[in-house]
Amino acid sequence: MTAIKKLTLQPRQLSFEILRDIYEQPVILTLPDSAYEAIDASHEDVQTIIRRDKSAYGINTGFGLLAKTRISDDQLELLQRNLIVSHSVGTGEALPANVVRLIMVMKVTSLAQGVSGVRRAVVDSLLGLINNQITPNIPAKGSVGASGDLAPLSHMTLAMMGEGHVYVDGNKVLAADALAQHGLEPITLAAKEGLALINGTQVSTALALRGYFLARDLLETATIVGSLSIDAAKGSDAPFDARIHEVRGHHGQIEIAKAHRQLIKGSAIRASHDGEQDDRVQDPYCLRCQPQVMGACLDIINQAGKTLLIESNAVTDNPLIFNNEDGPVAISGGNFHAEPVAFAADILALAIAEIGSMSERRIALLIDATLSGGLPPFLVDNAGVNSGFMIAHVTAAALASENKSIAHPGSVDSIPTSANQEDHVSMATYCARRLYEMAQNTATIIGIELLAAGQGIDFHRGLETSEPLTMAHQKLREQVTFYDKDRYLAPDIEAAKQLVLDGTLAEHWQPLRSNWYDSK
């Protein structure tokens, strides 16, 4: 059994390394004393504001269009409770535990910066859920990404209050029972605390981070599978000459070209048709333009990453508590508007779709005997009796086409809510949520390409590919045997897809990617 990692969560110090650790496995988190001091000071500021007996939005008023309705001090706790139960209106399947864990951690680091006005008990309640692996039941649908992720974060908060449901060891149970089982007390929310918990972009950001991690994984595996396809189709490595890419200057293009040069280097298949022996003047774009297309994908993945890392460390609730010369003040703003996350998710969708689109084109090339450098039709002996990879390509085409539709930017849509008080929204939650489905589609496409490219390498009997490509081919053959005649192919596709998703094919050439990503 793997030991659970313990981390001290420093506000504004979340890195991609930490975020990925939290995404991939349970953690035990603590906060430094300095964070608790900031939390305590901010809570005392809220008490000072209440004692002034003046209206302060989010503290002693209603919400949204009801912001001008003053709430008496004796109803402030009821106000917060009513806020949570009335906003717990999500629908759809529950978000998975790893995404919910990211949500809660980012909410903790936001509250711990000391401008949200909550008590330390609120933060400790969240840490109790995280550290005891209690996952609030958060329905996936119901947020428009402004004013924050209100509905899903309300479901999270409901669990802290001992209401609704949670998941423990994969089982759905009453939140009250789970808290009692782990010795945790349900929290009663005080002034400002409910709004601080549900006003924020943490759900959209967590879903976008999942898409970001998947996009990186897909690009890395698609690069080595793309090299495997080049060699299988007897493609040229000349288009990856560093000089071509340096005179254009795009970081991603330069790095992807470098990777292909190194991955193909030393291939006997490539040497067999080098120079005058190579009668193909130019390869189709899906082979020779991989640096230009996949490099552009790398660049926008990096751009999305920069945005998401900032947002992961951000305070995005409203109002926020600051100090003027004459004392504390609650200032209303709009940090809850998740437009940056929506834009980041939209460009990740473009990258994921294009990675799959290029992979589908390489599959089409490999099964086409007029383009594939001497490979048999549909990558199988005795074609006609055997159909080979004919319909596997149809599956890839279907998924690539589906992704193109799903990739339509969600951020260009907006629909007014809350009686037109919240009249422009980001749709960030949808933008980010769809990335998972798109990534699964693209992983399947790359898996099919891996099968096809591996098949092509096997047909070059007597000629070895390069060392890194041989390792990738061997890892494939450990899971899937050579396709010598027609057989039930769906299990092979699923096995290859898992190789794509688990990063197996990308492990042995990690040093070639040392300069790919701007944010660590």
UniProtKB/Swiss-Prot annotation:
Record bears the keyword Cytoplasm: yes
Gene Ontology MF terms: histidine ammonia-lyase activity
InterPro entries, per database record: Aromatic_Lyase, Fumarase/histidase_N, HutH, L-Aspartase-like, Phe/His_NH3-lyase_AS
Disulfide bonds: none
Enzyme class: lyase
Compartments where found: Cytoplasm
Pathway given in the UniProt record: Amino-acid degradation; L-histidine degradation into L-glutamate; N-formimidoyl-L-glutamate from L-histidine: step 1/3
Enzyme Commission code(s) on record: 4.3.1.3
HAMAP family referenced in this protein's UniProt entry, alphabetically: His_ammonia_lyase (MF_00229)
Protein name (Swiss-Prot/TrEMBL): Histidine ammonia-lyase
